[in-house]
Amino acid sequence: MLSKEGGFSEEQRARLSHFVTNLDSPIFALKNLPEVVKGALFSKYSRSTLGLRALLLKEFLDGEGGNFLDDDQQDCELGIQKAADFYRRVLDNFGDDSVGELGGAHLALEQVSMLAAKILEDARIGGSPLEKSSRYVYFDQKVNGEYLYYRDPILMTSAFKDVFLDTCDFLFNTYSDLIPQVRSHFEKLYPKDPEVSQSAYTVSLRAKVLDCLRGLLPAATLTNLGFFGNGRFWQNLLHRLQDNSLVEVRNIGEQSLTELMKIIPSFVSRAESHHYHHQAMVDYRRALKEQLKSFAHRYGEEREISKEAGVKLVYGDPDGLYKIAAAYMFPYSEHTYAELLDICRNIPNEDLMRILESGASFRENRRHKSPRGLECAEFAFDITADFGAYRDLQRHRILTQERQLLTTKLGYTMPSQLIDTPMEAPFREAMEKADQAYRLIAEEFPEEAQYVVPLAYNIRWLFHINARGLQWLCELRSQPQGHESYRKIAIDMAREVIQFHPAYELFLKFVDYSETDLGRLQQESRKKS
């Protein structure tokens, strides 16, 4: 309890000092508490008249659950299980899903296929992924004489086992064999400038080589991921993983649940197989998937399938500029948004342009974000590009992306630097071998066949984004240090939107349309200077 003076007693201050960063300021942070305890604490905080420090004393240190701490445990490793058992009831009593956002966990996922990595990274809100880079790390290593790629148990017990293994090994062998050849080719093509440090040149050259060759890696290639996510994120992701058609993904879901139950059990317990929420979610997702799949097959059978690669603007908001201008003025006006829209539709065009220019004219670099009003205009694109580029762009969050199955039916992207060189033929040979293997396997196992498809093969996806998100993406992904595949996509999206209406060029002023050689050289040189 609080002392009679309304503050904390010396003993209370001593106890609290282990768990808060200060005892007097109205702004402070929590420390040395398990995620489940912090989450439960905040869940009660929103419905209490007490301050958080007083609530921590009353409910967690002096109250019913006070014995969850052993006297000799006053650092990060506390009695997590004791706290979880007691405060699971607290969380369940409040019942709000948002309570699941008050605690989180870091999870390492190693030896995951690049195909599964994309399924993991489909989860958008509440989680932050980081993946092993294909431009800084070589993927030519072997362990016990085997290249590091996922061997799907269904394929490994099927008639396609040898085809799958032979094709993946061939792809990795080609990747490994071409590394020194491409490096030597680029050293001649882009000799080191005497004013550039050797280390900066080496890093840039390596990125160029690996960017060029990553398309040979099959989707089965093993990678490592690190995730931080809040409890609600993990619960939703686990439901999706456990219902996936791929064995690997379901196994990842089961193993992730096991580990997260050790850290944030109260936040992910609904994903346990025996929980009544779990089966209802699984049944819902399966029924929905089957229904939508049947519609797609029924209504798409008679129409010819486009195989054209590139970026195509499918939809642009015809009232987008009016919406942006009205939203720009809204916070500083007393009119309704509807009234401001009407005003913007009826003012002279030069006045409308002045309003739009005001949201862009003060920007000095791409990190100067435009006002949120820019989010009121939306665009939808059809994109058909290599899976490697998709892997990069899929990480963007504030938008809608939906992809189709990875196949070899849409062709592949040939690295421009290898065309008309001795390296072109082995690259194309590897692509053709992968195509043959995919088509053979896909007749019986269309989803598992994705594992044998190299990153150079094209995938089609829907890309729906607002103008502010497009601004950020195009200006970031068009920078010279980026991979040529996603640079082209970013530049093409910007051009498509500007062609839709030239006024949008105002908001895309830092898109870099230049052609580059060693794209990362300037950035690496800045690091060394």
UniProtKB/Swiss-Prot annotation:
Entry GO MF terms: flavin adenine dinucleotide binding; NADPH binding; thymidylate synthase (FAD) activity; thymidylate synthase activity
Entry superkingdom: Bacteria
InterPro entries: Thymidylate_synthase_ThyX, Thymidylate_synthase_ThyX_sf
Gene Ontology biological process: dTMP biosynthetic process
KW RNA-binding (keyword) present: no
UniProt keyword Repeat, yes or no: yes
Keywords: Repeat
PROSITE patterns hit by this protein: THYX
Pfam families, A to Z: Thy1
Residue ranges occupied by any ThyX domain in the UniProt entry: 38-274, 309-511
Family: Belongs to the UPF0159 family.
Protein name, per record: UPF0159 protein CT_632
Species per Swiss-Prot/TrEMBL record: Chlamydia trachomatis serovar D (strain ATCC VR-885 / DSM 19411 / UW-3/Cx)
